[in-house]
């Protein structure tokens, strides 16, 4: 096979992958504001300066794009958890802080702080809320359930903690989502605010 032809195909594929990634990020931002049914693919296309027909070349339906946005959203949370759990010492408590129930689980504490850091990306958290709201759709519900189950399993494996602690951890995470949706998150998440949000005083 002609080498130039092969290289051209590889380059085209890479370009499409980059466009796909950009498109999904733009979709997260738009879906975060208007939800699955209220969002126009035309507006998403304008965000990344591509044509609407090209959107449907990459994703046959708007729902396909929404499902891809769900995956990207959960992928980013999982990546944050993995990074935090790999080096929990980065999130050690300052001497002036204490935990209401003792030192707690270091890895779980680190993952909580990593999630608090994501609050600066308000659209990411708002999109999660829109994904939950769209669960009346069978495909969306199945995808969200699959990713939520995977996320809780990952957090449990990374922290080696109890079911009760994991339940409390994700309950606080949902509280963070609600706080973010009300716009009550500061521009920069201060240490004291983050500690209070995930159970530290």
Where are these regions (language model features)?
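Alpha-helix C-capping/helix-to-loop hinge sites
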Residues: 34, 84, 114, 131, ...
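Key DNA-contact positions within bacterial/archaeal DNA-binding proteins
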Residues: 53
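Helical hydrophobic small-molecule/effector-binding pocket
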Residues: 75, 90-129, 135-139
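Hydrophobic alpha-helical segments that form the core
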Residues: 122-134, 148-201
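Short amphipathic alpha-helices within nucleic acid-binding modules
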Residues: 143
């Amino acid at each position: 096979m002609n080498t130039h032809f092969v290289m051209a195909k590889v380059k085209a594929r890479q370009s499409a992958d980059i466009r796909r990634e950009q498109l999904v990020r733009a979709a997260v931002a738009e879906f975060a504001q208007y939800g699955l049914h209220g969002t126009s693919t035309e507006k998403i296309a304008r965000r990344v300066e591509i044509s609407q027909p090209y959107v449907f070349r990459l994703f046959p339906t708007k729902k396909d794009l929404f499902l891809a946005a769900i995956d990207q959203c959960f992928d980013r949370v999982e990546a944050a958890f993995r990074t935090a759990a790999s080096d929990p010492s980065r999130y050690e408590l300052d001497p002036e802080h204490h935990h209401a129930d003792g030192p707690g689980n270091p890895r779980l504490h680190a993952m909580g702080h990593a999630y608090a850091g994501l609050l600066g990306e308000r659209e990411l958290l708002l999109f999660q809320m829109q994904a939950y709201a769209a669960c009346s759709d069978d495909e969306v519900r199945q995808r969200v359930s699959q990713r939520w189950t995977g996320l809780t399993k990952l957090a449990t494996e990374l922290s080696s903690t109890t079911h009760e602690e994991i339940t409390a951890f994700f309950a606080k995470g949902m509280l963070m989502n609600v706080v973010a949706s009300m716009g009550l998150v500061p521009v920069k998440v201060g240490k004291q605010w983050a500690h209070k949000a995930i159970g530290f005083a």
